[in-house]
Amino acid sequence: MAGHSKWANTKHRKAAQDAKRGKIFTKIIRELVTAARLGGGDPATNPRLRAAVDKALSNNMTRDTLNRAIARGAGNDENDNMETIIYEGYGPGGTAVMVECLSDNRNRTVSDVRHAFTKTGGNLGTDGSVSYLFTKKGVISYAPGVDEDAVMEAALEAGAEDVETYDDGAIDVYTTPEAFGEVKDAMDAAGFVAESAEVSMIPSTKAELDIDTAPKLMRLIDMLEDSDDVQEVYHNGDISDEVAKQLEDIL
Protein backbone atom coordinates (compact mmCIF):
# COMPACT_ATOMS: atom_id res chain seq x y z
CA MET A 1 0.00 0.00 0.00
CA ALA A 2 1.08 3.55 -0.66
CA GLY A 3 1.90 6.01 2.08
CA HIS A 4 2.75 5.71 5.75
CA SER A 5 -0.19 3.80 7.18
CA LYS A 6 0.50 1.34 9.99
CA TRP A 7 -0.26 -1.43 7.52
CA ALA A 8 2.30 -0.08 5.06
CA ASN A 9 4.92 -0.06 7.81
CA THR A 10 4.39 -3.77 8.54
CA LYS A 11 5.06 -4.48 4.85
CA HIS A 12 8.43 -2.73 4.70
CA ARG A 13 10.29 -5.89 5.64
CA LYS A 14 8.54 -7.90 2.93
CA ALA A 15 9.21 -5.12 0.41
CA ALA A 16 12.91 -5.17 1.25
CA GLN A 17 13.02 -8.94 0.73
CA ASP A 18 11.24 -8.59 -2.61
CA ALA A 19 13.73 -5.96 -3.73
CA LYS A 20 16.63 -8.31 -3.01
CA ARG A 21 15.02 -10.96 -5.19
CA GLY A 22 14.60 -8.48 -7.99
CA LYS A 23 10.85 -8.98 -8.09
CA ILE A 24 10.03 -5.30 -7.59
CA PHE A 25 12.38 -4.30 -10.41
CA THR A 26 10.84 -6.90 -12.71
CA LYS A 27 7.36 -5.52 -12.10
CA ILE A 28 8.46 -1.90 -12.54
CA ILE A 29 10.26 -2.70 -15.79
CA ARG A 30 7.12 -4.34 -17.16
CA GLU A 31 5.11 -1.24 -16.26
CA LEU A 32 7.70 1.07 -17.86
CA VAL A 33 7.66 -0.97 -21.08
CA THR A 34 3.87 -1.10 -21.25
CA ALA A 35 3.38 2.57 -20.36
CA ALA A 36 5.88 3.63 -23.04
CA ARG A 37 4.29 1.33 -25.61
CA LEU A 38 0.80 2.69 -24.98
CA GLY A 39 1.54 6.38 -24.48
CA GLY A 40 4.98 7.08 -25.91
CA GLY A 41 8.41 7.36 -24.37
CA ASP A 42 8.22 10.93 -23.03
CA PRO A 43 7.23 11.07 -19.34
CA ALA A 44 6.30 14.75 -19.75
CA THR A 45 3.39 13.84 -22.03
CA ASN A 46 2.64 10.36 -20.68
CA PRO A 47 1.26 10.47 -17.10
CA ARG A 48 1.30 6.69 -16.72
CA LEU A 49 4.96 6.56 -17.73
CA ARG A 50 5.79 9.48 -15.43
CA ALA A 51 4.26 7.61 -12.48
CA ALA A 52 6.25 4.50 -13.39
CA VAL A 53 9.48 6.52 -13.65
CA ASP A 54 8.91 8.06 -10.21
CA LYS A 55 8.27 4.63 -8.75
CA ALA A 56 11.42 3.26 -10.39
CA LEU A 57 13.55 6.06 -8.97
CA SER A 58 11.96 5.68 -5.53
CA ASN A 59 13.11 2.05 -5.59
CA ASN A 60 16.66 3.06 -6.59
CA MET A 61 16.51 1.74 -10.14
CA THR A 62 19.42 3.07 -12.20
CA ARG A 63 18.75 5.55 -14.98
CA ASP A 64 20.35 3.14 -17.45
CA THR A 65 17.95 0.31 -16.59
CA LEU A 66 15.01 2.71 -16.58
CA ASN A 67 15.88 4.24 -19.96
CA ARG A 68 16.40 0.84 -21.58
CA ALA A 69 12.94 -0.26 -20.45
CA ILE A 70 11.37 2.91 -21.86
CA ALA A 71 13.25 2.50 -25.14
CA ARG A 72 12.03 -1.07 -25.42
CA GLY A 73 8.43 0.01 -24.94
CA ALA A 74 8.65 3.03 -27.23
CA GLY A 75 10.07 0.76 -29.92
CA ASN A 76 6.66 -0.93 -30.16
CA ASP A 77 7.94 -4.46 -29.78
CA GLU A 78 5.38 -6.63 -31.60
CA ASN A 79 6.10 -9.47 -29.21
CA ASP A 80 5.00 -7.36 -26.23
CA ASN A 81 1.29 -8.15 -25.93
CA MET A 82 0.80 -7.12 -22.32
CA GLU A 83 -2.56 -5.75 -21.24
CA THR A 84 -3.71 -4.25 -17.96
CA ILE A 85 -6.34 -6.29 -16.12
CA ILE A 86 -8.02 -5.34 -12.83
CA TYR A 87 -9.50 -8.02 -10.58
CA GLU A 88 -11.69 -7.29 -7.56
CA GLY A 89 -12.66 -9.37 -4.58
CA TYR A 90 -13.06 -9.76 -0.85
CA GLY A 91 -10.26 -10.97 1.38
CA PRO A 92 -10.09 -12.13 5.02
CA GLY A 93 -12.07 -10.02 7.45
CA GLY A 94 -14.28 -8.66 4.69
CA THR A 95 -11.50 -6.52 3.25
CA ALA A 96 -12.00 -5.06 -0.21
CA VAL A 97 -9.11 -6.00 -2.51
CA MET A 98 -8.17 -4.76 -5.98
CA VAL A 99 -5.47 -6.53 -7.97
CA GLU A 100 -3.80 -4.71 -10.86
CA CYS A 101 -2.13 -7.04 -13.35
CA LEU A 102 -0.08 -6.86 -16.54
CA SER A 103 -0.53 -10.05 -18.50
CA ASP A 104 -0.19 -11.65 -21.90
CA ASN A 105 -2.39 -14.58 -20.83
CA ARG A 106 -5.70 -13.82 -19.11
CA ASN A 107 -6.43 -17.47 -18.31
CA ARG A 108 -3.15 -17.93 -16.45
CA THR A 109 -3.54 -14.68 -14.56
CA VAL A 110 -7.12 -15.17 -13.39
CA SER A 111 -6.23 -18.70 -12.30
CA ASP A 112 -3.37 -17.41 -10.14
CA VAL A 113 -5.49 -14.63 -8.64
CA ARG A 114 -8.48 -16.87 -7.93
CA HIS A 115 -6.20 -19.47 -6.30
CA ALA A 116 -4.76 -16.84 -3.92
CA PHE A 117 -8.22 -15.66 -2.87
CA THR A 118 -9.52 -19.20 -2.39
CA LYS A 119 -6.50 -20.39 -0.37
CA THR A 120 -6.88 -17.52 2.10
CA GLY A 121 -10.63 -17.68 2.60
CA GLY A 122 -11.49 -14.84 0.24
CA ASN A 123 -13.61 -14.60 -2.88
CA LEU A 124 -12.82 -13.23 -6.32
CA GLY A 125 -15.65 -10.87 -7.25
CA THR A 126 -17.04 -9.30 -10.40
CA ASP A 127 -16.11 -6.00 -12.02
CA GLY A 128 -17.31 -3.14 -9.85
CA SER A 129 -17.80 -5.24 -6.73
CA VAL A 130 -15.28 -3.21 -4.68
CA SER A 131 -13.79 -0.59 -7.01
CA TYR A 132 -16.39 1.96 -5.87
CA LEU A 133 -14.66 1.92 -2.48
CA PHE A 134 -11.39 3.26 -3.95
CA THR A 135 -10.27 6.52 -5.55
CA LYS A 136 -7.19 6.88 -7.74
CA LYS A 137 -4.79 9.44 -6.29
CA GLY A 138 -1.16 10.42 -6.42
CA VAL A 139 0.69 9.79 -3.14
CA ILE A 140 4.01 11.49 -2.40
CA SER A 141 5.50 10.30 0.89
CA TYR A 142 8.12 11.97 3.06
CA ALA A 143 10.06 10.29 5.86
CA PRO A 144 10.04 11.58 9.46
CA GLY A 145 12.27 14.57 10.00
CA VAL A 146 11.03 16.90 7.28
CA ASP A 147 9.59 20.30 8.20
CA GLU A 148 5.87 19.58 8.44
CA ASP A 149 4.71 23.17 7.97
CA ALA A 150 7.06 23.77 5.05
CA VAL A 151 5.99 20.58 3.27
CA MET A 152 2.32 21.37 3.79
CA GLU A 153 2.71 24.93 2.50
CA ALA A 154 4.71 23.85 -0.55
CA ALA A 155 2.35 20.98 -1.35
CA LEU A 156 -0.83 23.03 -1.19
CA GLU A 157 0.77 25.83 -3.19
CA ALA A 158 1.78 23.26 -5.83
CA GLY A 159 -1.80 22.04 -6.18
CA ALA A 160 -2.00 19.06 -3.82
CA GLU A 161 -5.46 17.94 -2.71
CA ASP A 162 -4.57 17.03 0.85
CA VAL A 163 -1.67 16.51 3.25
CA GLU A 164 -1.72 13.87 5.99
CA THR A 165 0.72 13.87 8.90
CA TYR A 166 1.54 11.01 11.27
CA ASP A 167 2.61 10.79 14.89
CA ASP A 168 6.16 9.79 13.93
CA GLY A 169 6.58 12.86 11.72
CA ALA A 170 6.02 11.16 8.37
CA ILE A 171 3.93 13.00 5.79
CA ASP A 172 1.81 11.89 2.82
CA VAL A 173 0.85 14.38 0.13
CA TYR A 174 -2.20 13.48 -1.96
CA THR A 175 -2.88 14.74 -5.49
CA THR A 176 -5.22 14.04 -8.36
CA PRO A 177 -3.70 11.60 -10.87
CA GLU A 178 -3.52 14.43 -13.42
CA ALA A 179 -1.63 16.78 -11.08
CA PHE A 180 0.73 14.11 -9.70
CA GLY A 181 3.71 14.88 -11.94
CA GLU A 182 3.37 18.65 -11.59
CA VAL A 183 3.13 18.52 -7.80
CA LYS A 184 6.04 16.07 -7.56
CA ASP A 185 8.19 18.36 -9.74
CA ALA A 186 7.30 21.38 -7.61
CA MET A 187 8.15 19.54 -4.39
CA ASP A 188 11.45 18.36 -5.85
CA ALA A 189 12.26 21.92 -6.94
CA ALA A 190 11.49 23.15 -3.42
CA GLY A 191 14.11 20.76 -2.07
CA PHE A 192 11.85 18.10 -0.56
CA VAL A 193 13.11 14.60 -1.37
CA ALA A 194 10.30 12.04 -1.40
CA GLU A 195 10.69 8.64 0.20
CA SER A 196 8.27 7.25 -2.39
CA ALA A 197 5.93 8.61 -5.04
CA GLU A 198 3.26 6.74 -6.97
CA VAL A 199 -0.29 6.82 -8.26
CA SER A 200 -2.33 4.48 -6.08
CA MET A 201 -5.89 3.46 -5.25
CA ILE A 202 -6.89 4.95 -1.89
CA PRO A 203 -9.80 3.35 0.02
CA SER A 204 -12.66 5.57 1.18
CA THR A 205 -13.50 3.24 4.08
CA LYS A 206 -11.38 0.93 6.22
CA ALA A 207 -11.96 -2.63 7.46
CA GLU A 208 -10.46 -3.11 10.93
CA LEU A 209 -8.53 -6.37 11.26
CA ASP A 210 -7.61 -8.26 14.43
CA ILE A 211 -4.54 -10.37 15.11
CA ASP A 212 -6.26 -13.42 13.60
CA THR A 213 -7.41 -11.89 10.32
CA ALA A 214 -4.47 -9.53 9.67
CA PRO A 215 -1.94 -12.34 9.00
CA LYS A 216 -4.45 -13.99 6.64
CA LEU A 217 -4.71 -10.81 4.59
CA MET A 218 -0.92 -10.55 4.59
CA ARG A 219 -0.76 -14.09 3.22
CA LEU A 220 -3.23 -13.19 0.47
CA ILE A 221 -1.19 -10.14 -0.47
CA ASP A 222 2.04 -12.15 -0.46
CA MET A 223 0.52 -14.86 -2.67
CA LEU A 224 -0.77 -12.27 -5.12
CA GLU A 225 2.50 -10.33 -5.21
CA ASP A 226 4.44 -13.53 -5.83
CA SER A 227 2.68 -13.82 -9.20
CA ASP A 228 4.75 -12.29 -11.98
CA ASP A 229 1.55 -10.96 -13.55
CA VAL A 230 0.48 -8.94 -10.50
CA GLN A 231 1.73 -5.35 -10.46
CA GLU A 232 -0.11 -3.86 -7.48
CA VAL A 233 -2.44 -5.00 -4.71
CA TYR A 234 -4.74 -2.43 -3.11
CA HIS A 235 -6.90 -3.12 -0.06
CA ASN A 236 -8.79 -1.33 2.69
CA GLY A 237 -7.50 -3.40 5.60
CA ASP A 238 -6.57 -1.40 8.70
CA ILE A 239 -4.91 -2.36 11.98
CA SER A 240 -4.69 -0.80 15.42
CA ASP A 241 -1.38 0.15 17.03
CA GLU A 242 -1.67 -2.92 19.22
CA VAL A 243 -2.16 -5.30 16.29
CA ALA A 244 0.65 -3.58 14.37
CA LYS A 245 3.01 -4.22 17.30
CA GLN A 246 1.92 -7.86 17.52
CA LEU A 247 2.51 -8.30 13.80
CA GLU A 248 5.99 -6.82 14.05
CA ASP A 249 6.78 -9.28 16.84
CA ILE A 250 5.76 -12.33 14.80
CA LEU A 251 7.14 -11.28 11.40
UniProtKB/Swiss-Prot annotation:
<keyword id="KW-0804">Transcription</keyword>
<dbReference type="Pfam" id="PF20772">
    <property type="entry name" value="TACO1_YebC_N"/>
</dbReference>
<dbReference type="InterPro" id="IPR049083">
    <property type="entry name" value="TACO1_YebC_N"/>
</dbReference>
<keyword id="KW-0238">DNA-binding</keyword>
<dbReference type="GO" id="GO:0005829">
    <property type="term" value="C:cytosol"/>
</dbReference>
<keyword id="KW-0963">Cytoplasm</keyword>
<dbReference type="GO" id="GO:0003677">
    <property type="term" value="F:DNA binding"/>
</dbReference>
<comment type="similarity">
    <text>Belongs to the TACO1 family.</text>
</comment>
<dbReference type="GO" id="GO:0006355">
    <property type="term" value="P:regulation of DNA-templated transcription"/>
</dbReference>
<dbReference type="InterPro" id="IPR026564">
    <property type="entry name" value="Transcrip_reg_TACO1-like_dom3"/>
</dbReference>
<dbReference type="InterPro" id="IPR017856">
    <property type="entry name" value="Integrase-like_N"/>
</dbReference>
<dbReference type="InterPro" id="IPR029072">
    <property type="entry name" value="YebC-like"/>
</dbReference>
<protein>
    <recommendedName>
        <fullName>Probable transcriptional regulatory protein PMI1113</fullName>
    </recommendedName>
</protein>
<dbReference type="InterPro" id="IPR002876">
    <property type="entry name" value="Transcrip_reg_TACO1-like"/>
</dbReference>
<dbReference type="InterPro" id="IPR048300">
    <property type="entry name" value="TACO1_YebC-like_2nd/3rd_dom"/>
</dbReference>
<keyword id="KW-0805">Transcription regulation</keyword>
<dbReference type="Pfam" id="PF01709">
    <property type="entry name" value="Transcrip_reg"/>
</dbReference>
